[in-house]
Design a protein with these regions (language model features):
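Soluble catalytic domains of enzymes that build or remodel membrane lipids, polysaccharides, and related
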Residues: 1-154
Length: 154
């Protein structure tokens, strides 16, 4: 799914590059693997807000009663996507602040969802700080990571 940087570069161009490289892009669509619904919701174009819960509910074949993961660039609209049937959201966007002291700002904006795994009332949200940088090619005062998530049936 797209994020803000793909929008900055030109979403269609970025999507075409990914697809030419053989990457399956879930842009407001879903795939099902062993009964697990994996939903990708693309970042809003031209800065207009996006209703992620409506996007999830509008995806053909989405069943709120089945296990599901939402891939969305920013850790936002958590109660709404939970109400739509999502049980795990995986996001990024915050870069964990990237350069000290910006981490304080991301914590202020995204609250407890600014980094790591947070579980609340039937939904888990994982926000990856990522490994890269935006703007200056540097990271200070935070720890980049490559995340491995192992899912186990309940």
């Amino acid at each position: 799914m797209t994020g803000n940087h793909e929008i900055y570069l030109g979403a269609e161009r970025a999507l075409a590059v990914a697809r030419r490289a053989g990457i399956r892009v879930l842009e407001d669509e879903m795939t099902v693997i062993d009964g697990l619904q994996i939903v990708g919701v693309g970042y809003p174009r031209r800065g207009e807000p996006k209703d992620n819960a409506a996007a999830v509910r509008g995806i053909a074949g989405f069943d709120p009663g089945r296990p599901s993961i939402l891939l969305y660039h920013s850790p936002v609209q958590i109660p709404e996507v939970k109400a739509a049937g999502v049980r795990l959201q995986i996001s990024g966007h915050t870069h964990h602040g990237q350069i000290f002291p910006v981490g304080w700002l991301t914590r202020l904006i995204y609250g407890r969802y600014y980094r790591g795994l947070n579980e609340e009332d039937g939904i888990a949200v994982y926000t990856s700080p990522g490994t890269g940088a935006w703007g200056p090619a540097m990271r200070t005062g935070n720890t980049p990571e490559v995340t491995v998530i192992r899912l186990k049936p309940r």
